[in-house]
Amino acid sequence: IAPGNTIEYYESVVSALGPDQGDWLRLFMVPGMGHCSGGDGPDQAGFMAALERWREGGESPERITAYRVTGNRVEMSRPLCPYPRTAHYKGIGSVNDAENFECRLP
């Protein structure tokens, strides 16, 4: 699925129904990931766990932490933010640690 088409679809839903759709609609982009895996960004995340917490417990995801793992070692982690927010480095700590990023509007 091309990322541009996904963003266009999300924006068309928000345009048709209004901006307050966050209780049932969230878009999380994965920068640097190829189609389904690979690329120079993270390629693993707990999407199903986040979806289950949202559906079963009413806890909507404000961010999902994604990882790039080689063998049993985490090489990097990044926060995935609900669109249109994106991850921004705080300027302190390792750029390979999701805790050193915050989700905010571009």
What are these regions (language model features)?
Residues 1-106:
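C-terminal His-loop and adjacent cap/lid subdomain of alpha/beta-hydrolase
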